[in-house]
Amino acid sequence: MYVSPTMTGEGAAFVYNGYNEWCNPYELSITLNGELKTTDHQVVTSLNVAEKIDLEGDGKICPEINQFTSDTFKATNGDVLPYASFTPEKDDKKNALVVWLHGAGEGGTNPEIAYLGNKVTSLISDEFQSNFQGAYVLVPQCPEGYGWPVDKDGNYTSGATPSKWRESLFELIDNYVTSRPDIDANRIIIGGCSNGGNMVYDMVLSHMGYFAAAFPMCHEFDINTVTDEQLNYLKTFPVWSTYTLGDSSSYKGSIPIVEKMKEIGATNFHYSQFDNASDVTGRFFGDPSDPTILDTTGTSKIPLQYDGHWAWTLF
């Protein structure tokens, strides 16, 4: 059935109530009324769709669910963090670890949301895994509130004050590493989108020397909050930042950092800047007069344009 991420009423698996949740119960009533085409524009003549489906946790929407393991971690301060993880095939060698920090929409107590909300499953794809010859993937989930960049008083922070989750999150990551001897402690890479991108910088700069590289996206971390020591550390620390010019967050976080890294002559800072967040799958196209509207004619070759904040779709 031809649908797109921008359409409404098409039976989305998630509902958004401040953050994403499984649509449960998931019930559909679908009838064929007029011409319907598949994604390759073949005409559908009949439908046979179950009216009630239990989507949660069984791989119906995304078979990769079955490759992740979910658990919880209790930190020494009492924080309980849900997380999901992927284990590569045993190969008698050290493996890298990739840590993903979700955005505001994927918090809660079901880590499936944290790795499905932004297609983090791409990190376990053959294409991505081949770059590391197999890598562990760890997806922590912030269990409450607005998400990772919140200080001890419950206020949003872009770096001026430390995240209340800083130490419990680091403890989870470090415990995961030390309990798996085949993880290469010299190849721990951390990335994340939106407020997860804020937290990437919080973690890197509060535990300098621990992470090997970082890949933040579409964040609002304020480079003006860092110390001279931290700024000097970033001068050589490997970072690849991704953002769009169509995202207001870019002008608070990503772009000022790019400018500062150029100013100080950073030697290992890289970035991908896009005009907007357009579809890269080749499946969805926009109306020629307005690419933010889905083209249903099958004739447009202009990629569908998403919200400018969705830089993770370009990763």
Please state what every model-predicted region is:
Residues 108-114, 148-153, 202-203, 226-227, ...:
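Short, solvent-exposed loop/turn and secondary-structure capping segments
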Residues 133-135, 233-239:
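Short, proline-enriched alpha-helix->beta-strand connector loops that line the catalytic pocket
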Residues 178-179, 185-233:
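Primarily recognizes the serine-hydrolase "nucleophile elbow" in alpha/beta-hydrolase
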Residues 1-97, 258-259, 269:
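A domain-start/cap signature at the N-terminus of enzymes
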Residues 101-103, 218, 243:
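The conserved beta1-alpha1 loop
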Residues 89, 93, 151-194:
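Gly/Ser-rich "nucleophile elbow"/oxyanion-hole loop immediately N-terminal to the catalytic nucleophile
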Residues 97, 104-167:
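Active-site machinery of serine-nucleophile hydrolases
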Residues 240-258, 262-315:
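C-terminal catalytic histidine-bearing segment of alpha/beta-hydrolase fold enzymes
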